[in-house]
Amino acid sequence: MIVYSVFIFAVLAISSVTGIFLPGGGGKKCGGHGEYGSGVIIGAERPKK
């Protein structure tokens, strides 16, 4: 379980960092729109649509 949480943390960190470098402020869209960064991963594991 600890490994899973660490993996999620790493994924969110990497996706948020990549979102910053994406055009259009991808970091702000994380976790909701599923377009940039962690939004894609979170949307895949826990779809809230």
From Swiss-Prot:
Pfam families (UniProt xref): Fungus-induced
Coiled coil: none
Protein name: Fungus-induced-related protein 16
